[in-house]
């Protein structure tokens, strides 16, 4: 997996202060997407064990308390990203059980296949659906267009 950007301190992509990872790779390529540079699977940087360790360390950092981890992109549910994302969310839930995990995907909940659904037990909030420019609304909380749905599994 590649990632496009990592923000160890983020107050925009989810509630509270968070760590946010923007992965590379998206098949949806939505018209009007603000993250078009993440569409290619090869864009950005190689995701490594060192990066995963850094995310865990940042989540555990008591100097700057983070509420949780946000995963966006690109698309964390892209088939090429699933193995690395699953490993990361499992590790977060094991080593940082007090942290929540938010994940944004262009797939709807109904469209997820079995391998994508394997992530759901580790996700607290899923924001699903493609960005549809004609339904864009900057006043929406945590989503870009009115068709997108916020699924709160544990929060």
Swiss-Prot record:
Is Cytoplasm one of the keywords?
yes
Q: Name one GO molecular function term.
A: metal ion binding
Where does it localize?
Cytoplasm
Query: What cellular-component terms does GO give this entry?
Result: cytoplasm
Q: What is its main location?
A: cytoplasm
Q: What is its EC number?
A: 1.97.1.-
List ligand-binding residues for S-adenosyl-L-methionine.
32-34, 74
Q: Which keywords has UniProt assigned to this entry?
A: 4Fe-4S, Cytoplasm, Iron, Iron-sulfur, Metal-binding, Oxidoreductase, S-adenosyl-L-methionine
Q: Which cofactor does it need?
A: [4Fe-4S] cluster
Catalyses which reaction(s): glycyl-[protein] + reduced [flavodoxin] + S-adenosyl-L-methionine = glycin-2-yl radical-[protein] + semiquinone [flavodoxin] + 5'-deoxyadenosine + L-methionine + H(+)
Q: Which Pfam families match?
A: Fer4_12
Question: Entry's PANTHER family?
Answer: ANAEROBIC RIBONUCLEOSIDE-TRIPHOSPHATE REDUCTASE-ACTIVATING PROTEIN (PTHR30352:SF2), PYRUVATE FORMATE-LYASE-ACTIVATING ENZYME (PTHR30352)
Which family is it part of? Belongs to the organic radical-activating enzymes family.
- Kindly state the subunit structure of this protein: Forms a tetramer composed of two NrdD and two NrdG subunits.
Give the function comment from the record. Activation of anaerobic ribonucleoside-triphosphate reductase under anaerobic conditions by generation of an organic free radical, using S-adenosylmethionine and reduced flavodoxin as cosubstrates to produce 5'-deoxy-adenosine.
| Protein name per the record | Anaerobic ribonucleoside-triphosphate reductase-activating protein
